[in-house]
């Protein structure tokens, strides 16, 4: 095994029995042959489960919507990319020549995806207990810094953080109607989210309020919140 990969194993805190799993987890789809997308899918599911389990135990009084918002904050791409940079993961990625030239080893989404793929690889290599231990160790700083105050953000911010945690495009807002006199207007705003087949609507006395209402409706439609949180 490459000494460099041995160094990465020490940083991750896991020594792979099956080195091919580790190499596959570091292989981007731009590289020829098999890639890490299936491992990323598996790792994403494990990450969300472990994070959800930890939050459930840590915040026994939190409501479902609050737990969902905390998890979205915990597993968003930005957080994972910061962890990946701490492991200097970009140095170990297998990328196609085009991605290398464009700086793909620094790109947030590629780093976050590779870290999720490594979680999936650790699970296949050593089981759920090992994967849980690594995830909780990596996220310990973020977990310790979370409070229920973090769930008191406005709907637009919560929606943006949820979508970022899924590596999705940010929502788009558009004013579709304005009614009433200049001193007493009502704005109608549409919110378009890539994960939803239909746009959500919001109405309010200002564009800002209407956008917040539309974002709240999108969170409910996505199943992130139930309208009672």
UniProtKB/Swiss-Prot annotation:
This protein's UniProt keywords: Cytoplasm, Endonuclease, Hydrolase, Magnesium, Metal-binding, mRNA processing, Nuclease, RNA-binding, rRNA processing, rRNA-binding, tRNA processing
Domain spans labelled DRBM: 154-224
Keyword match Acetylation: no
Positions with a binding annotation for Mg(2+): 40, 113, 116
Catalytic activity: Endonucleolytic cleavage to 5'-phosphomonoester
SMART domains per record: DSRM, RIBOc
Protein's cellular compartments: Cytoplasm
Pfam families, alphabetized: dsrm (PF00035), Ribonucleas_3_3 (PF14622)
Record domain RNase III: where: 5-127
GO molecular function, one term: double-stranded RNA binding
TM stretches of this protein: none
InterPro entries in the cross-refs: dsRBD_dom, RNase_III, RNase_III_dom, RNase_III_sf
Cofactor: Mg(2+)
E.C. no: 3.1.26.3
PROSITE patterns: DS_RBD, RNASE_3_1, RNASE_3_2
Main location: cytoplasm
Gene Ontology biological process terms from the UniProt entry: mRNA processing; regulation of gene expression; rRNA processing; tRNA processing
Gene Ontology CC terms, in alphabetical order: cytoplasm
Active site: 44, 116
Stored HAMAP family: RNase_III
Subunit (UniProt): Homodimer.
Entry similarity comment: Belongs to the ribonuclease III family.
Its biological purpose: Digests double-stranded RNA. Involved in the processing of primary rRNA transcript to yield the immediate precursors to the large and small rRNAs (23S and 16S). Processes some mRNAs, and tRNAs when they are encoded in the rRNA operon. Processes pre-crRNA and tracrRNA of type II CRISPR loci if present in the organism.
Descriptive protein name: Ribonuclease 3
């Amino acid at each position: 095994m490459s000494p460099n990969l041995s160094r990465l194993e020490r940083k991750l805190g896991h020594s792979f029995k099956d080195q091919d799993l580790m190499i596959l987890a570091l292989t981007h789809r731009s590289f020829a042959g098999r890639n890490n997308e299936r491992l990323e899918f598996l790792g994403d599911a494990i990450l969300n489960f472990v994070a959800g389990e930890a939050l459930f135990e840590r915040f026994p009084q939190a409501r479902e919507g609050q737990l969902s918002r905390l998890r979205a904050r915990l597993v968003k791409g930005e957080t994972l990319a910061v962890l990946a940079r701490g492991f200097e993961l970009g140095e170990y990625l297998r990328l196609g020549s085009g991605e290398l030239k464009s700086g793909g080893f620094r790109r947030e989404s590629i780093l976050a995806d590779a870290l999720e793929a490594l979680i999936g690889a650790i699970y296949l290599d050593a089981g759920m207990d090992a994967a849980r231990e690594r995830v909780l160790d990596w996220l310990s700083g973020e977990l310790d810094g979370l409070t229920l105050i973090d769930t008191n953000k406005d709907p637009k911010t919560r929606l943006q953080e949820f979508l970022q945690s899924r590596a999705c495009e940010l929502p788009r807002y558009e004013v579709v109607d304005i009614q009433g006199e200049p001193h007493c207007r009502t704005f109608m705003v549409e919110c378009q989210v890539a994960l939803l087949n239909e746009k959500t609507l919001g109405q309010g006395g200002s564009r800002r309020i209407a956008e917040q209402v539309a974002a709240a409706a999108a969170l409910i439609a996505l199943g992130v919140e139930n309208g009672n949180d």
